[in-house]
C-alpha cells in the first residue's frame, strides 16, 4: 500500500518534470490521491470498521473548527489554508490562486474523510447480503449526505478549493446516489449495453488520468503554424465550427477524453489492467 502511494506521488512529479524545482508545484491531484490512499490504508487496517464513521465525523468537525477560527472561508492569502501551505512549502511551490492551493496540506484532512466514506461504501457493496438491501442502504446514505451538505451550506459554503465539509457531503452524497442508480440499472434491471465505457476507464483509472495530463502537456508544447497544437485545434476546428464559447471548451475536454478512451479500450481489449 505504501508503495502504491509513493508511485502515485512519483508519477505526478515526473509528469511535471519539465519545470525547474524552484517553480515545481509540490501539491497536486496525484499527490493528494496518494496521501489519502496511504492514510486510509493505515486507518482501515488498525481501526475497526464500526468506528470509522465516528472518525470521519471527528475529522470533518476538527477541520470545520479550523476553518471558522482561521479565516478559512476568506478567498485570499490570509486564509489559514494558504498560511500553512506558504509557511511549509513556500509560495513558489503552490498553485497561485489568491494564495490558496486546492490540494494543499490542511485540506488533506477532509479529503481523507472523503476517502474513508468511499471505503465504507465499498464495504457495503461487497457484503454478501441481498442486493436490494444493499441498494436501500446506499440510497439512504446518499440521500442523508446530500441533504446534510445542502442544509449545512448555510453556515459552511460548498467549496472545492478549501475542500469544505459540505463539499465532502454533497459530492459523496451525489456519487453514492449515482452509484445506486447504476447498480439498479446494470445489476438489478440487467441493462448492460452501452456501459462498457465505464469499465474501460475504471480498470485503468490512474493510467487514463496520467495519460490525459501528458496529452494536455504535449498539446500546449507542440507548435503548429505559430500556435500551440492545443490553440490551433481549438481555433481552427472547434471555435471555427461551433464558436468561441463554453461548448467548444467542453468539446476540447471531450476530445482529450476520447483519445484517452481509445487508448484505454486498447489496453482493456488486451487485458492489460
Q: What is the predicted function of each stretch?
A:
Residues 49-117:
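Long hydrophobic alpha-helical segments that form multi-pass transmembrane helix bundles
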Residues 101-111, 160-176, 199-208, 226-261:
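Membrane-interface transmembrane-helix boundary segments in multi-pass integral membrane proteins
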Residues 135-147, 165, 188-215:
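Functional transmembrane helices that form membrane-embedded active or gating regions
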